[in-house]
Design a protein with these regions (language model features):
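Sec-exported extracytoplasmic/periplasmic mature domains
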Residues: 11-15, 40-44, 63-67, 79, ...
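Charged, glycine-interspersed solvent-exposed loop segments at helix/strand-loop junctions
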Residues: 82-170, 174, 178
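Small-residue-centered hinge/linker elements
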Residues: 1-16, 22-29, 71-115, 119-121, ...
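Glycine-rich beta-to-alpha active-site loop
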Residues: 31, 40-83
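Solvent-exposed, polar/charged alpha-helical surfaces in well-ordered, non-transmembrane soluble domains
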Residues: 4-11, 33, 37, 60, ...
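N-terminal secretory signal peptides
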Residues: 1-22, 26-43, 113, 129-134, ...
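Solvent-exposed, acidic/flexible segments
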Residues: 1-3, 25-32, 51-55, 67, ...
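Low-complexity, Gly/Ser/Thr/Pro-rich intrinsically disordered linker/tail segments
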Residues: 149-232
């Protein structure tokens, strides 16, 4: 509910650059998916900082961000309904099959791999499996959201032209290679400053589409403090 309220407030205040810091041990799976859909519909960058965690149901919210920046710990395990009325393994299995079917549909529409849900099933609820950097990339939980990236490419090609999209792709690769990974304690602003220095070499800001040029929101103003939130 908190994340949904934050998303609604950002819409009402017309906040264009939206950064949400996640730091949560989890919560209810259905609530997390509902909150994630609200995040996905309102265009947020989600961060898990080096001193933060995103465990259990929090991972579902992480999947929904337009972009994800992770330096903290992301962990998964089996998710159960705390209010479950199951009394046998068969009843619990049927209940979990329904939950995980919804979860897989949710992950798929948010550009994350459904393999995340399968992996969750193998980790007992009382334990936790931390995901490596490679796994976060493989499962579509870190960096740019694949589905949102497709939508953005379609829009930019329509409004700014194919050359703009090609140059932006080249810039994005250079940014990932040179600037994206932030050392603990360095601060995300260092990555943005690095990216701003790269832009001119790729013809940005673009005269036709200056507002859609990479990091345009950071050009003239310092970044505001991000909103802090968890999934509890």
């Amino acid at each position: 509910a908190l994340v949904e309220r934050v998303a609604n407030i950002a819409e009402r205040l017309e906040i264009k650059r939206r950064i949400l810091d996640l730091d949560s041990s989890g919560g209810h799976v259905e609530d997390a998916m509902k909150a994630g859909d609200a995040i996905g519909a309102s265009h947020w960058m989600l961060r898990v900082r080096d001193d933060a965690i995103c465990h259990s149901a929090c991972v579902l919210i992480l999947a929904a961000g337009d972009d994800r920046l992770i330096t903290g710990k992301v962990g998964i395990h089996r998710m159960i309904r705390i209010g479950s009325e199951a009394t046998t393994r068969a009843e619990l299995n049927q209940e979990l099959r329904e939950v995980y079917a919804k979860m897989k549909d949710y992950l798929e529409r948010n550009g994350a791999s459904v393999a995340v849900a399968d992996l969750m099933m193998t980790v007992p609820n009382r334990k936790l499996r931390l995901l490596t950097e490679d796994e976060l990339q493989e499962y579509g939980l870190d960096g740019t959201n694949a589905v949102q990236d497709d939508l953005e490419r379609i829009r930019l090609t329509r409004e700014c032209g194919e050359d703009f999209v090609r140059r932006k792709d080249d810039f994005d690769r250079a940014y990932e290679r040179s600037c994206a990974k932030v050392e603990p304690g360095q601060g995300q602003e260092a990555a943005y400053e690095c990216g701003l220095a790269l832009r001119a070499g790729f013809g940005f800001p673009d005269e036709t589409c200056p507002k859609d040029s990479p990091l345009s929101e950071y050009q003239d103003a310092a970044a505001p403090d991000p909103i802090q939130a968890g999934t509890q």
